[in-house]
Every structure is written in structure tokens, then in C-alpha cells.
Amino acid sequence: MELHTLKATPGSRKAKHRVGRGHAAGKGKQAGRGQSGQTKRSTVRLGFEGGQLPLFRRIPKRGFNNVNHVEYQTVNLVDLENKYSTGEVVSYETLLAKGLIKRNLPVKILAKGTLTKKLTIEIPTLSQSAKTAIEKVGGTIIEVK
């Protein structure tokens, strides 16, 4: 006896019954699904509760999506302190190069943490507290559109 000559015992491996393939196959016509009705057909759609008002329609609608909403990537003063040295320029390109931002979205600098280095900021959007913190250290903010 060798592995490549092994065979299953006759009758131990039964072929699966293919239903709905005609009378001669033994499972034709109703294919084991009984008389006509909901259970004979395909499954009910997702969220269907047998005719009862479904949950997604029972719960009230809330809110709206503002078409003018702008999502910003945020960079904190702590990040600038850690990644930049004194006198460097902070721009969209340098932020991308240093891995502080990833997506192609506008950037906003926020005032979390402290800043001790003089930096030149070329980012259009800053929080008011970040602006004052940068100017207090002696950094400059260049207006960019």
C-alpha cells in the first residue's frame, strides 16, 4: 500500500444531490422547497422584517451634510518643534516630505504644545492661538493663498 494508490471505500463518498435539475434527477419540480410562497423563492432582502415597518424606517432622520464643509489635516506646534530646526520654512511641501501630512487636503496649524524655534510659516490656515505662539517666539507668517 502506497499513498498514491489509496482509494475511498466504495459507498463512503456520496455525490451531492443537485436539486432543481428535472424529474429524472429525483429532486426536480419543487426541489425540496415545498409549495409556492416566500420560502420557495430566493431570500428576503436585507432589512426586511416580514412586512413590519423596518428599523431603518422607524428611526427618525437627523442632521444633514454641509456641502461647504472643509476637512483639514491638523498639524500641532509640538510636531513642528520635533521635526523642524530653527530658521526652516514650514510649507505644504516640507510637511509632506517630513511625513506630517498624508492626504491631499488643506492643512491647519493648531496650538497644541509649545514652540521654541523661529520658523517661517507658509501655510494659509492657522488657529489664532497658534499665530500668537509663533509670533511670540519671533517666527514669521507669510500669507499664502
UniProtKB/Swiss-Prot annotation:
Matching Pfam families: Ribosomal_L27A
Basic residues: bias regions: 13-26
InterPro entries xrefs: Ribosomal_uL15 (IPR030878), Ribosomal_uL15/eL18 (IPR021131), Ribosomal_uL15/eL18_sf (IPR036227), Ribosomal_uL15_bac-type (IPR005749), Ribosomal_uL15_CS (IPR001196)
Record GO biological process: translation
GO CC terms, sorted: cytosolic large ribosomal subunit
Region: Disordered, residue numbers: 1-42
PROSITE patterns named among the record's database cross-references: RIBOSOMAL_L15
Swiss-Prot/TrEMBL keywords: Ribonucleoprotein, Ribosomal protein, RNA-binding, rRNA-binding
Domain of life: Bacteria
Binding partners and assembly: Part of the 50S ribosomal subunit.
UniProt family annotation: Belongs to the universal ribosomal protein uL15 family.
Record function comment: Binds to the 23S rRNA.
Record-given protein name: Large ribosomal subunit protein uL15
Protein species of origin: Metamycoplasma arthritidis (strain 158L3-1)
Lineage, opening ranks: Bacteria, Bacillati, Mycoplasmatota, Mycoplasmoidales, Metamycoplasmataceae
Record gene name: rplO
